[in-house]
Amino acid sequence: MKITKLEKKKRLYLMELDNGDKCYITEDTIVRFMLSRDKVISEEELKEIQDFAQFSYGKNLALYHLSFKARTEKEVREYLKKYDIDKNIVSQVIANLKEDKWINDGQYAYAIINANQLSGDKGPYVLTQKLAQKGISKSTIEEILNDFDFSEVAQRVANKLLKKYEGKLPARALQDKIIQNLTNKGFSYSDAKIAFDDLDSQVDQETTQELIFKELDKQYTKYARKYEGYELKQRLTQVLARKGYDFSDIASALREYL
């Protein structure tokens, strides 16, 4: 077979043969096989050219994808699938990129976790979930997590939450709110409790009284339309307890309020 045309088409070249066959190849393929118009090639050589062209095209696509930011192996595989590249060729591209250090799931996970240590607010459970979604193995994630202490991150998040809710909630509700937020962010209950216990979060009696009377004003308006006497008192006690107020504080406030 003889090459009758080599024509540049954007990123690729169109190669035509005298038997009517056509295929798109990369510039790297032309250089590697020293292709030119009128060059004679065999069936075996054509297969090699086509395979390498697919590999070269896939690698170029992957490198373009990686040029914006680091990616995991799973992310690169999914990107290449969009271009209908043969699965075997994709595996060859991935192996080549891993060998050249373009893809390293361990380094990717370490970078994400380390960045979280410096300025993030996620605990190990949420980080594990996010990294697993990107295709990183559980064993790799666990191995890297073992190198990090999340107590400082938990304390940093707890301090921010304290600033947000202090003076707005009674003591028990404040504790519940901060611990719940920490567990939602991926910290274990024990780590969240330790972080809360290390806070200077004393809610004084004056603040508690101010909060409970403010809440009473709102709830009394709501329940006094339907209830009175003992039942009204019970309804108000229940709703205030659900909001985190101690029963002794509730009883004291109701004696003054009603």
UniProtKB/Swiss-Prot annotation:
Belongs to the RecX family. The keyword Cytoplasm applies. InterPro entries: RecX_HTH_1st, RecX_HTH_2nd, RecX_HTH_3rd, Regulatory_RecX, WH-like_DNA-bd_sf. This is Regulatory protein RecX. The lineage of its organism: Bacteria, Bacillati, Bacillota, Bacilli, Lactobacillales. HAMAP family: RecX. It is found in: Cytoplasm. Modulates RecA activity. GO terms for cellular component: cytoplasm.
